[in-house]
Amino acid sequence: MISVVERVKYTNPVFVEAHISDIHFGATDPAKQFKILKEQFLDYIDKLQVLDIVSINGDIFDHKFMANSDAVMYACNFIELLISICARKNATLIIIAGTALHDADQLKLFYHYVGGAADIRIVERVQFEYIKGKTVLVIPELYNMGREYYEQFLYNSGYYDSCYLHGTYKGAIFGKDTPELDSAREPVFAMSHFIHCKGPIIAGHVHTPGCFDKHFYYCGSPYRWKFGEEEEKGFLILLHNIETMQYYIHFEPIKSFRYDTIN
């Protein structure tokens, strides 16, 4: 069976993308987190013959940290290495704001990279990003914004090629079974909200990878640090032809810490 690296090498889709989320630097030993990401994510995407977009779909951090903490140091090292890969491959890096208690306004640590050697988009409000002819709706996790705020992007701005977000999809989290854009907390999305999306919706927030209603995908988190997450961990590779609207998503597993829940 041909590997995804070889599939990228021998085919020529319009876009080749890597999606990762819920990194949560500082949830466990950040040195070990960095080692896993360096060896199994950064080194992997560096081998791809083509790379157009890398998207971090929320929650780089686990909570607010002191600037001199190991979590901040390793997170900055990770982003710096990722930017160097993107610069060499002429890839766009999208960094999406995640849960407020996790990213905690710390994406400012990366503002100084914007306008540098690589094309970097740090997204902290809902907006469209235009990347090499591809239109992407990007939705960070926001609170109490109201239905009209989201509807102007979802329904009143025309068609778009794909959507990347950090957030909640109906049925993906216990107790979140009803779609709701007017929530006092974060909205709960459903496929009906993405009727103008011509491609996949790829999200962070839920730590187990999965697909809902055929076109909504969660990356899952890249490693384990607690019980109850025995499912495979990893990241997504997206091959997306925006002309034919065909796409292929490959889940690339990451070897991680093992936790066994015994009932």
For the regions a language model picked out, list residue spans one by one.
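Accessory, non-catalytic peripheral segments of nucleic-acid enzymes
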Residues: I2-P13, I53, H240-N263
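Short amphipathic alpha-helices and their capping/turn segments at secondary-structure boundaries
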Residues: I2-N12, I36-V50, Y149-Y159
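Beta-strand-turn-beta hairpins that frame and shape the catalytic cleft
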Residues: V8-A18, F128-V138, G158-S162, K214-F216, ...
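Core catalytic region of metal-dependent phosphoesterases/phosphodiesterases
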Residues: P13-V16, I23, A27-Y130, H193-K198
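Conserved beta-sheet core of the metallophosphoesterase superfamily
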Residues: G175-Y247
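Conserved catalytic scaffold of divalent metal-dependent phosphoesterases
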Residues: A97-S192, P222, L239
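Active-site flanking residues adjacent to catalytic metal/cofactor-binding acidic residues
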Residues: I20-S21, N57-D59, A97-G98, L165, ...
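Active-site environment of divalent metal-dependent phosphoester hydrolases
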Residues: H24-T28, D62-F65, I95-L107, E129-Y130, ...
